[in-house]
């Protein structure tokens, strides 16, 4: 693609602000702007004009249908397609799309998770247009980003609470900015940049593995001779087949207005990453959902399959999603960007203090937002941050915080340089913060990088939590400082008190070190090791009170989300255990039994001929013993599957305590049998095929 074509391609399938300026009247465009920036209502006449322009634009580009595109609590996206046609005279049709069609739709909500927010027979749900998210074209359909709510008004999606949290943190942050004399900023916008990791495998091999097709990850697989020990895949040369996929992916994402910026190989074989430019949290969430969908579709065009599971292969790194979060004013200021020197920037330090306090007080809830079975395979496994929340600030910023706590003057080290050691190369200015890859929440110069997210999950939940927690702390600060008679003195006291009271959450060391887990326990930090431990904190009183107070969730809405996550935990493990049992019964046990029998027959024939058969006997004996144990393990797993309690919380605990050990035992035995079996006798592709064939 030529350089000239790229600007034309970008956003070509998006009904964006530039297109609105071209196609709407000045009055209608301004009405839409007021709706987005000020929350003003949109008159039906303006909605009709926007709908008409949107339809004309879409039809010109080959669209025949439209859909209200929304994000239910499944974590995926949903859409129902309606054509533009309407009956006309003489058996003909006309194309129609009104303001009412744009602004509101009706969906059967009975098949989406609701967590008890509606009865089964209460099927009616409503979708409502989000005017702050641009409509886009996907495969001949005009997609209109919307929210989803029940007939009773409860939020049944992930976008509604995200929008609420963005408004709330903006409101509280503006109060703080006013105290510092900022009278220009009208809004504060949470901005997010999610780095998306993924695996690519050959489609033919994928189709031969029931576990990949049913669960998205391998449930069996012996360690191959080579994994990621050579450290040669990370940032390595991109193979032609993968490069073709990435090029196609970029072009499709750019056409959809998604700021795909960086692409590279990741640490594990067959693992890669795409990182976008930061944008507002609402758009970033829409874009990330769309990115995951487009990745899967583009991969199929290249006879590949894109795996978004957190741990598709044992023994090599899994996939995460680093969530880079910051607060920016509508005048272009990043509130987490220090001034000329951080020590002189009181406003920055106050926002930093709010973040530190919030993460400390709601560390359990932040952990719960990333809690699900797939992520349990990553967190704390020396490839991802531990399950203990902590904040990395870097040496200089931590030194500033410590000087504030001690009441001593901070002596700035000055700008350091990196000496390369080559005469022709100039010294390079060194950043004030290093990149601590082991930290779950790292300050990286002008933002915080929340590194605990799983690769497959929606980024809405974690960002709703960050926005709401920050809003709570800023509200407390504003309530206190707005009454101050001596602002500067009270500000300094507040910052010192907050850092003193919450310094336990700050940790700049190696999060992979076992010593840190012991130290975290001494500090009183929570260590919710598994999703089964973390999910119940959704409904802890302090957490429910927080979200209800700020109007992000009603009590019913947050309880519903907890119930959905808890039920999903058991559902995922049940599907994995059933898939494992099916593969054992129909593929692995027959294959290993057949090969063991062949060894015995071969040994008997050698015996008749007086030829040594010690090797055959030894392998047959080990395989026979392992097969018996594997058969027993399969039966136990099937028995345990039949005993799952009806109560959701009990079922989650039972699945964690019984199904996971059952699956681990079965896998251990099966993987050893794979190592003893000839390649041609194993019933499906092995790791060396899957990881090194693309």
Set out the residue ranges of the language-model regions.
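Glycine-rich, acidic/polar active-site loops that bind/position phosphate-bearing ligands
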Residues: 123-308, 317-320, 327-565
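Active-site-proximal loop/turn and secondary-structure-junction residues that shape catalytic pockets
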Residues: 46-50, 70-72, 100-101, 148, ...
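C-terminal amphipathic alpha-helical interaction region
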Residues: 495, 500-694
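Basic/polar N-terminal segments that are highly enriched at the extreme N-terminus
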Residues: 1-7, 692-694
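Hydrophobic/aromatic-rich, well-ordered segments within soluble, folded domains that form packed cores
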Residues: 63, 67-71, 287-301, 327, ...
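Histidine/acidic residue-rich metal-binding segments in metalloenzymes
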Residues: 4-99, 104-119
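Active-site proximal loops enriched in glycine and acidic residues that flank catalytic Cys/His/Asp
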Residues: 46, 70, 98, 276-278, ...
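Short linear, low-complexity motifs centered on an aromatic residue
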Residues: 75-90, 107-110, 209, 216-218, ...
């Amino acid at each position: 693609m030529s350089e000239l074509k790229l600007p034309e391609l970008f956003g070509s399938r998006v009904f964006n602000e530039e297109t609105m300026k071209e196609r709407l009247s000045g009055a209608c465009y301004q009405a839409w702007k007021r709706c987005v920036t000020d929350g003003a209502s949109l008159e039906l006449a303006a909605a009709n004009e926007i709908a008409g322009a949107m339809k004309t634009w879409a039809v010109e580009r080959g669209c025949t249908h439209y859909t209200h595109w929304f994000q239910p609590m499944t974590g995926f996206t949903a859409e129902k397609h309606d054509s533009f046609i309407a009956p006309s005279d003489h058996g003909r049709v006309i194309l129609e799309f009104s303001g009412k069609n744009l602004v509101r739709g009706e969906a059967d909500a009975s098949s989406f998770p609701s967590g008890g927010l509606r009865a089964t027979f209460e099927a009616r749900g409503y979708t409502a247009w989000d005017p702050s998210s641009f409509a886009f074209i996907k495969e001949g359909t005009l997609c209109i980003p919307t929210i989803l709510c029940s007939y009773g008004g409860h939020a049944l999606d992930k976008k509604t609470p995200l929008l609420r949290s963005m408004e709330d943190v903006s409101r509280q942050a503006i109060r703080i900015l006013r105290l510092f004399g900022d009278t220009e900023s009208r809004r504060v916008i949470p901005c997010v940049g999610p780095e998306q990791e993924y695996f690519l495998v050959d489609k033919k091999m994928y189709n031969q593995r029931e576990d990949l097709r049913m669960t998205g990850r391998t449930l069996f697989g012996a360690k191959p001779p080579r994994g990621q020990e050579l450290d040669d895949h990370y940032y390595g040369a991109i193979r032609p087949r993968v490069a073709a996929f990435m090029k196609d992916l970029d072009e499709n994402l750019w056409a959809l207005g998604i700021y795909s910026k960086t692409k590279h190989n990741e640490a594990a074989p067959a693992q890669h990453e795409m990182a976008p430019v930061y944008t507002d949290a609402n758009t970033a969430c829409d874009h990330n959902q769309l990115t995951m969908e487009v990745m899967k579709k583009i991969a199929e065009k290249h006879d590949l399959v894109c795996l978004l599971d957190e741990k598709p292969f044992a023994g090599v790194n899994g996939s995460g999603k680093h969530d880079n979060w910051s607060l920016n004013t509508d005048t272009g200021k990043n509130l987490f960007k220090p001034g000329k020197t951080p020590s002189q920037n009181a406003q920055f330090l106050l926002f930093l203090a709010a973040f530190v306090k919030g993460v400390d007080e709601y560390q359990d809830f932040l952990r719960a937002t990333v809690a699900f079975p797939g992520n349990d395979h990553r967190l704390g496994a020396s490839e991802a941050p531990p399950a203990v929340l902590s904040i990395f600030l870097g040496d200089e910023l931590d030194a500033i915080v410590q000087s504030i706590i001690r009441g001593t003057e901070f002596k700035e080290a000055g700008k350091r340089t990196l000496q390369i050691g080559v005469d022709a190369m100039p010294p390079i200015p060194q950043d004030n913060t290093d990149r601590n890859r082991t930290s779950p929440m790292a300050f990286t110069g002008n933002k915080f990088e929340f590194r605990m997210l799983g690769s497959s999950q929606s980024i809405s939940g974690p960002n709703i939590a960050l926005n709401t927690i920050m809003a709570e702390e800023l509200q407390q600060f504003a309530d206190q400082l707005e009454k101050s008679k001596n602002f500067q003195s009270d500000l300094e006291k507040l910052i010192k008190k907050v850092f003193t009271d919450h310094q336990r959450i700050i940790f700049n060391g190696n999060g992979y070190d076992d010593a840190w887990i012991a130290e975290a326990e001494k500090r009183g930090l929570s260590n919710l090791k598994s999703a089964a431990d973390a999910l119940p904190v959704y409904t802890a009183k302090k957490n429910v009170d927080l979200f209800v107070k700020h109007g992000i969730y009603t009590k019913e809405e947050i309880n519903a989300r907890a119930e959905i996550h808890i039920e999903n935990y058991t559902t995922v493990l049940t599907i994995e255990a059933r898939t494992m049992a099916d593969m054992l019964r129909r593929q692995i046990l027959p294959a290993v039994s057949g090969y063991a029998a062949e060894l015995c027959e071969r040994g008997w024939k050698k015996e008749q001929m007086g030829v040594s058969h010690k090797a055959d006997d030894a392998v047959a004996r080990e395989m026979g013993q392992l097969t018996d144990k594997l058969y027993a393990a399969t039966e136990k797993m099937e028995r345990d599957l039949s005993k799952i309690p009806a109560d959701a919380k009990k079922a989650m605990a039972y699945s964690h305590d019984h199904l996971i050990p059952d699956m681990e035992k079965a896998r251990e035995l099966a993987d050893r049998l794979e190592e003893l079996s000839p390649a041609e006798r194993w019933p499906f592709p092995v790791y060396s095929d899957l990881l090194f064939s693309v």
